[in-house]
UniProtKB/Swiss-Prot annotation:
Family: Belongs to the Casparian strip membrane proteins (CASP) family.
Protein topology in the membrane: Multi-pass membrane protein
Keyword Glycoprotein: yes
Protein name as annotated: CASP-like protein 1D2
Length: 193
């Protein structure tokens, strides 16, 4: 069967001698956002770890009763998750700095960043949610369950530290979402149109 194609071939399937577009280079913003993620993780961990407070509670007789982050598994998970996030942000900041000088490595690295950033976002969000749930119980209590009374009127310094740490971790979650969007947009801008 004879081909009915024109000598030039189908323009849609023709190979181009021009290279693919370089795309928009946002690696400087990527480094800044990754540094912000590190700072947010570090601040959140330091603030919650220093949230120790001891108050005298009057049960039949006065007893000193401490409140520490390590007494709640949710807060321990929060500290562990944000510590992992801080380490991850250091590693990826260094990788971004090294890749900024090597254009061939940038696109592949962006794809890996999207995948790992999404995983880290899940870790940060789950840790912030669990710590936020426990903090809310400390603030408001649960009148439907015996023994789940509010404690923030007694342990005010501890609750302020926990609340501030959760707020900073929430900022870290937003920074991670921005990192994912930035990487996705950078990859999208590199796709030939």
């Amino acid at each position: 069967m004879a081909s009915t194609d024109k000598p030039g071939g189908d323009p849609e399937y023709r190979t181009s001698s021009t290279p693919a577009p370089a795309g928009v280079d946002y690696f400087k913003f990527d480094v800044i956002l990754r540094f912000l993620l590190f700072a947010a993780s570090l601040v959140a961990v330091v603030v919650i770890v220093t949230a120790n407070q001891t108050e005298v509670i009057r049960v039949p007789q006065p007893v000193p009763w401490p409140a520490k982050f390590r007494y709640s598994p949710a807060f321990v998970y929060f500290v562990a998750a944000l510590s992992v996030t801080g380490l991850y942000s250091i590693i990826t900041t260094l990788a971004s700095l090294l890749a900024s000088n090597k254009p061939a490595l940038k696109t592949k690295l962006l794809l890996y960043f999207i995948l790992w950033d999404a995983l880290i976002l899940g870790i940060i969000a789950s840790a912030t949610g669990t710590a936020g749930g426990v903090a809310y119980l400390g603030l408001k209590g649960n009148r439907h369950v015996v023994g789940w009374n509010k404690i923030c009127h007694v342990y005010d310094k501890f609750c302020r530290h926990v609340g501030a740490s959760i707020a900073v971790a929430l900022f870290g979650s937003v920074v991670t979402v921005l990192l994912i969007w930035l990487s996705a947009y950078s990859i999208h801008s590199r796709v030939p149109k």
